[in-house]
Every structure is written in C-alpha cells, then in structure tokens.
From Swiss-Prot:
UniProt name for this protein: Protein PIMREG
Tissue expression per record: Mainly expressed in thymus and ovary. Expressed in all T-cell subpopulations isolated from the thymus, macrophages, pro-erythrocytes, granulocytes, mast cells and progenitor cells.
Upper classification of the organism: Eukaryota, Metazoa, Chordata, Craniata, Vertebrata
Modified residues (Phosphoserine): 11, 16, 72, 128, 191, 193
Post-translational modification note: Ubiquitinated by the anaphase-promoting complex/cyclosome (APC/C) complex in the presence of FZR1, leading to its degradation by the proteasome during mitotic exit. However, degradation is not essential for normal mitotic progression within a single cell cycle.
Amino acid sequence: MASQWQGMRTSVRRRSLLKEEQLEKKEVTRSAGGHPETGPLGSLCRQFQRRLPLRAVSLNLGNGPSWKRLESPEPEQQGLQAAARSAKSALGAMSQRIQESCQSGTKWLMETQVKVRRKRGAQKDRGSPPPSLSQKNTRLCRANRDARVGGHLRLSGQMGPHAHRRQRLRRESALRSPCSSTEPLCSPSESDSDLEPVGAGIQHLQKLSQRLDRAIKAEESGDMTVSLIRE
C-alpha cells in the first residue's frame, strides 16, 4: 500500500509539473512576441530550474568487518617472524635432502638387484658356478685334518705298541669334528651381506680345531708318561 501511495503522489507531482511547464511555455511565447531579447535567456533559466522529484533510497548495508589500522610490528614480533621464516626454510631444505637421499637409496638398491641378477644369469649360462667361500672352508678343513692325521700316524709309528689304539682314537675324534662333514656349513652367499655368517662360521671352526689340538696333545702327553713308566 505504501508503494502504491508513493506512486500516486509521484504521478500527481509530474502532472502538476507538466502543467506548470505548459503555462511557462505559453508565457514565454507571449513575452517573446513583446520582448524578443529575453526569450533565449528565459529558456536557459527555466532549464536550470527544472528538477525531478527525489526518492528516498534505503541502503541495505549489513554489518561489515571492522577494519583495523595497519601498524608496523614491534621489534620482538619482527624477530619472531624472522626466526619462523628461517625455521621454515631449514625444514624445507631438510625435507628436500631426505627425499633426495631416499630416491638415491632406492635407485642404488634397484641397480644392485639388477647387477646380482645379471651375475646369476651369466653364471647359469657359463655352467657350474664358481666355488663359494663355504666350499673353500671345507676344503681347507679337510686338508688340515689330513695333515694332522698324517702327523699323528708318524708319531704313533715312532712311539711303539700303543700306536694303533691312539691312532684309532684320533681317527674317531677327527671324524666327529665338523670339518669331516661333506655338507657346507653355510649356504653360498648371494650378496655382500651374506659374508658375515661365513666369517662367524670360520671363527667357530678355528675354535674347534684349537680344542681338538689341545685334546690330542693331552692324549699324547698322557700316553708318553704311561709308556715311560712301563719302561
């Protein structure tokens, strides 16, 4: 209803203004006939005097954000901001280095796997694989055992009638040692990481051989004392 009343009022005002303009035009024509000089000046004045009716405009503006004045930060805040920037840059550099190292590690692993596979293929193409470290160790143990048995036989031949018994005991102890087994102690190494158990096996074999030597020496010393007492 209020909008309708406002529209009616504006229409009434326009009609009244149009009527006034028509009356002014009639007066201008009449005055122009009597006073021709004042005609254009009067029309200019009337054009400047014309005004349209103003309407009330409602500004539908909501409560906007409260803007604060931008101030320069304090020196303490500036120091904190600089420290935060340096920490961010350092963390970014560290993360980049870590990513690069991980990528290089994966590349190295892939390259080593490819090399190992190529070596295996070449060995299969050539025929029988070369002797591994475990096989070499077993051969060395057998050679040491043969040398010990030969030396013991010589000593037993020189010592007298009890040589056969001592020889039999030494053979039994030699056969009980792990060096006499034909199976390898360690599986053939496929990469450099398998060398550690091979070294541990070698050390174990050395300890066992030392114990065997001590036992043989003890038996020999006991047999010598017995033979001397009997003589």
